[in-house]
Amino acid sequence: DRQGAEFLRKYGHDGNYNWYFALTREGRPLVQPYNIFSYTFAAMAFAQVAVATGSDEYAMIAKRTFDRILEKRANPKGEWCKAYPGTRSLKSFALPMILCNMALEIEPMIDKQLLADTIGECLHEVMEVFYREELGLIVENVTEDGRLSDTFEGRQMNPGHSLEAMWFIMNLGVRLDDRALIDKAVKIALNTAEYGWDKEYGGIFYFLDRKGAPRVELEWDQKLWWVHIESTIAMIKGYQLTGSKECQEWFGKLHEYTLSLIHISEPTRLDVIS
């Protein structure tokens, strides 16, 4: 809404559209603008408020923020990056993945050719670099030249992240009228759900290791809420777009598992595709 947008317009960035990670309620910066996802969500938010209100200023903020994101793509954290340069340089799936989603949200504000180029580059990264045909799955980190890395970070698998990305890709497939892209995203989503599902206790693991080794993250086996929300969205969207029986079955499985762990007085059952 305008009240939230005005607060962020005044206090959310440093004047050059570098967006702080956190603020006090009075608007004073708490955390430096190190996180590129503060920028991506700001761009999406201001783009949508601009569409809703017709504000040229909000549209400009979305556009300027998008430009900053593109400038920072090669080194998103900039001066706040903790990694020592040149030792084990990896690139992350997270940025091209979120740009696939952001592209559709800010489309009205962006030059058509720039938007097309950005979408093309991000689709290539997500579906040809981070997606590994030999695994049938998406990896979280690769070397700067796109190779697998036999390191803790390089072997990290994040099923929820991959499933979230696949419904972004399905949306792009609709926008581009690309049936093959939609079908590929559905195939990857199904592979990922099968891979990430805990066969003993149910639910999708937070992190896994590409080679089956123990993970370093203490929370690797937790069943996080967002993982199951994104997975459910991916499956219902896959079913909607393709009629896939497997997507329908996975939607039901994920939905029932998730609601079995949520304690509310009147649980809601979605029977629309049962």
Describe these PLM feature segments.
Residues 1-16, 61-78, 119-137, 185-200, ...:
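Long, well-ordered core segments of solenoidal/helical folds
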Residues 26-61, 89-124, 128, 148-191, ...:
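Aromatic (Trp/Tyr) and acidic
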